[in-house]
């Protein structure tokens, strides 16, 4: 996230995908690339540069960042940024990844054509908690569960630092894949990831519902090889997602078991803060509440809390120590 003028944060809420014509120019970014996903001809690759919170394709990611700046502020801005050299970058990274993986995010900007004055790395759960309106600097323990597109990060925060954190390779995409597999098994129907996502949005629930709700989906019949339409129920979607949801619950319980008693009292009192785009799934809060006995705080725009938190860290000198220079010895 680059440093814009005070109080105007251009946030991008779009798919982190990039479409590249093989070995040539980038073609599309974000939602536009997503619309090509699974429809593109062989010479167009749709890549996901970040997988499970870690950079999987360095070149694609670098291209994507440069394109974002062109797209966000126009070509002039991008060229000015490359020439001017006074940009400040703040990058939120998962806490539970290796030092090398964290450094890769730093290198991404440092080795790009963007001239930078300052590159800072922020632990994502800290930015997340700040953006969610929690006071991260005091001695109170806060439990934050961020269920995103590709990962779920469960973190215990106190005194501006991370006490415990677990990063799971479970998120919206994993739910979509599970739905795709289950529909294939149950209905002999091959559906695309976008159709799976639509089923999730229409039918998913954190808690098994008594009432049956249905939604029609198009796909290719495995036996005949022909296009086919089937009616999928919410119960099937619940079955598809239950394993992933159980893993999230287990990880939350794991963090709670490892929480020091003083901080446990804080969490009993304040509950769990839920963020990330996947918290839009119906009854997911109810599931966590039932399984842990804790109250749940939900956000208005759960997918934007990290970005908001980064903005606060940039603008408020009191939060300076939450942003690390990778040369610092205090950053692990």
Language-model-detected regions and their locations in the chain:
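Nucleotide/phosphate-binding catalytic cleft detector across ATP-hydrolyzing
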Residues: 1, 5-147, 156-272, 279-306, ...
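Positively charged, low-complexity, intrinsically disordered RNA-binding extensions
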Residues: 152-153
């Amino acid at each position: 996230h680059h440093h814009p003028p005070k109080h105007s944060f251009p946030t991008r809420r779009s798919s982190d995908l990039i479409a590249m014509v093989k070995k040539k120019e980038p073609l599309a970014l974000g939602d536009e690339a997503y619309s090509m996903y699974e429809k593109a001809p062989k010479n167009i690759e749709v890549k996901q540069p970040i997988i499970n919170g870690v950079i999987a394709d360095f070149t694609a990611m670098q291209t994507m960042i440069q394109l974002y700046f062109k797209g966000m502020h126009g070509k002039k801005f991008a060229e000015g940024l490359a020439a001017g050299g006074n940009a400040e970058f703040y990058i939120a990274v998962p806490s539970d990844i290796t030092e090398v993986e964290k450094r890769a995010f730093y290198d991404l900007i440092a080795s790009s054509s963007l001239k930078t004055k300052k590159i800072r790395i922020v632990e994502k759960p800290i930015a997340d908690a700040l953006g969610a309106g929690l006071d991260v600097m005091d001695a109170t323990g806060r439990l934050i569960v961020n269920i995103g597109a590709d990962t779920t990060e469960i973190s215990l925060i106190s005194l501006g630092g991370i006490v415990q954190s677990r990063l799971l390779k479970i998120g919206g995409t994993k739910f979509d894949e599970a739905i795709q597999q289950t529909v294939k098994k149950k209905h002999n129907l091959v559906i695309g990831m976008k159709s799976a996502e639509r089923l999730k949005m229409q039918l998913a629930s954190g808690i098994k519902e008594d009432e049956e709700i249905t939604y029609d989906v198009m796909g290719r019949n495995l036996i005949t090889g022909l296009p086919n339409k089937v009616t999928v129920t919410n119960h099937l979607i619940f079955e598809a997602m239950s394993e992933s949801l159980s893993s999230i619950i287990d990880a939350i319980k794991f963090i709670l078991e490892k929480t020091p008693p003083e901080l446990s009292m804080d969490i009993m009192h304040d509950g769990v803060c839920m963020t990330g785009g996947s918290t839009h799934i119906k009854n997911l809060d109810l599931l966590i509440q039932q399984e842990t006995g804790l109250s749940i705080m939900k956000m208005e725009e759960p997918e934007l809390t990290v970005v908001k938190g980064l903005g606060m860290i940039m603008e408020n000198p009191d939060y300076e120590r939450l942003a690390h220079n990778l040369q610092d010895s205090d950053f692990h």
